[in-house]
Amino acid sequence: MNLVVTALVKQVPKGDHSGRLDADGRLERAGAVAEMNPWCRRAVAQAVRLAGETGGRSTAITMGPAAAVDVLREALAWGVDDAVQLSDPALAGSDCLVTARALAATIRLLDDPPDLILVGNSSVDGSTGAVGAMLAELLGLPFTGPVLALEPADGRLRTTVQYDAGTESVTIDLPAVVAVAERSCDPAKAPADTWPSPDVVRQVTTADLAEGSWGLAASPTKVAQVHPAPLTRNPVIFRGHPQSQATRALAELTARGCFQQQSTPPRSGRQAAGEGSGAAPAPSEWTGLQVAAGQASRLPSTTPAPDGGAASRPLSTERRGAPRGEVVVLVGDGPVEGTRALLGAAAALAAEVGGVVTAVATEEGDREFARWGADSVVTLDGDEPRAVARALTGWLQGRGAWAVLGAALPWDREVLARLAVTSDAGLMSDLVSLSAKEGRLSGLKPSGGGTLAEIISRGTPQIATLRTGLLPLRTPRDDRPLEPQTLHVEPDTAIFRTERRTGSDGDALDRAEVVIGVGRGVPPEKYDELEPVRLLLNAELAATRKVTDQGWLPHGRQIGITGRSVAPRMYLAVGLSGNLNHLAGASRAGTVVAINTDPAAEIFAHCDVGLVADWQEVMPYLVDGLRSCVSG
């Protein structure tokens, strides 16, 4: 089979961008040095490989301003046969749904319909991870990803899909849309002096597309404002002999209460997630999705902190006025603690807007879901994302649902991205908090330059995915039975799944009290030297994107804008520079401790306690001191 392969590529700012908005409310990118998105480099490399190996043809498409032609020139230099740029001022401010529509319309202009459309799994400037699935829905195609390996066979594509907790073998019918993982291959990088002239790129405007509405005005979601991340930490930096630094740092951490009695880390399983709760305390009305106590100072006022600890705040049984709609929560096979936190967040929102919570789940769990916040439960009898989205589309018609929420995980992302297309509602993706503002949903997500972008939606229903590791666990309410309901889901014969392999316990990061983050300054053969401090602190190991890209730690251990977000009691950053895209994932840590040999490293501006030292020299002294701190 001579494969016709199309790779979608995006130009992104190189490094951190400012996060500022222009006069029209769009993220300001003028003057920033730009490059091809790292994930898109893999899509280009795979497109060239597959087309070359099968005697086919490859095309690269980008949507962006005139300067974005450079990513196509680089793709052509790498070996892509054709390139198309969609560029029009009318497209400025397009959200992911309008972007997907414009790209779908551009693909329909191609002389040869593609057998395979490759997209990067994410982007360093937005991390929606939704355009690929939206594009698949618009084109009526199956979707899978992020894939580590892909090979054509008899009109189908055999892939290995990467998840936080391992991999899965997936075979998918062609034509299809596939998201490419960053570790799938070496990136397509060509020296600028080898790029061809821009004249060889085919130029397309909205006038060439089928009739449609474009740009910010047509987008159901938008960035309302960008909140700067204030430097709320007051770093205490130590220098000198490693032993002296360790002694002084431990004294500072002890004074901060960092070594007070640690609670037992949450165990997996629904029983553990709700164990020991007993009867619910007296009802206490929620006023929106809250963050853990003591962490609100690092967030705008849209997410007020509760009076008590995050794990002790009870679920509310009160509703304000007559129900005006419902908050639907999509429950897949993600971490149990994440499901509990998400249902609690939904109950908070429902209390705010006078609604109810309906859990739509792939497996039965009526009693647990009810205790965690659900007022009703619907069980799906199938779990293929495309088919689930179709079933939900029909089920939601006429219900007047106020919002549909899911976790920021691959299954939830695909279902809700497809639902965003069929409902014309758009998607707010990878949010770290939610609130109700004037009866509408508002969410925050990490943006460039260490900022938080406030996203709003005018769609109906309002659809969002959340990073559940940052949501508080609420005390379950009284056990009560719910009437079982079932929603039929048709099978999807275009996709076949086999052999799911578990390779990572990255989900443990979501509720870890202490996290040790490692950068490239800690080579993998030295990880054993971190074991004593990890065991003493009962900590989980995490990493920067560059570490996981190199395969030193599993992808599920990555923290940052394009990885996980955590809120531990203490975050120990070892051998990492402090890139703001990484620190966005640990911004809600109670105390940040940094160890780096470079006194000018960015991490020292965003920590509470810093040690200017070689981690291998200072760590033995820290371990010796920690033994008495922890035991005491």
Question: What is each model feature region?
Answer:
Residues 1-632:
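N-terminal glycine-rich FAD/FM-binding segment characteristic of electron-transfer flavoproteins
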